[in-house]
Amino acid sequence: DRLAAGARALKRRAPEFPVRARCVVQRQNFADLPNAVATAHQLGLDQLSFLAADVSSSAFNRPLPWDAERVAEVALSRDEVSAFEEIVERLIVESAADFASGFIAESPEKLRRLPRYYRAINGDGDYPETICNAPWVSTVVEADGTVRPCFFHGALGNLHEQPLESILNSADAIDFRRRLDVRRDPICRKCVCTLQLGARAAAP
């Protein structure tokens, strides 16, 4: 109810302002993808995006990566992945207009990456290929001033100690970007939140 009230309030105040939502798909809600799309329409949202749950990193304020028990609470089992694949294929057919209009942010092929990701967690196949240039076109600044090349990789510095420009152009930061191969890096290969923005700059 609070989410619906907030979305309505935004639309009343600025009807032209786009209101987008992201649904993290995990064990408790993977069967509800069609309901998520219907609810997004009911709320008057402009777009809905789906994302797999990150179960392998120490990002998002986790002091340590999750243990196997915690991962199993969130990630899909083998049987659930099979059911999820069917749900995704059905959604692609039944919500074709939402894919075509961009209301569902992901393309059908990109949405199919989600069950592939959970299959890989269960040891059944490879993770979807990573295509990402986040460390070259963006940065993450945390509440305490920590600067990271993305949500998942280690810190490059802190705004309370150096200006952002100095951090991003430091020898360590340049070397990190120069050496990073997103298709082979173990952190990148399991990433659920890739970014591909514009043409990658020539600078390291």
What are these model-derived regions, one by one?
Residues 124-133, 140-204:
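Flexible mid-to-C-terminal extensions adjoining Fe-S/redox cofactors in radical SAM and related proteins
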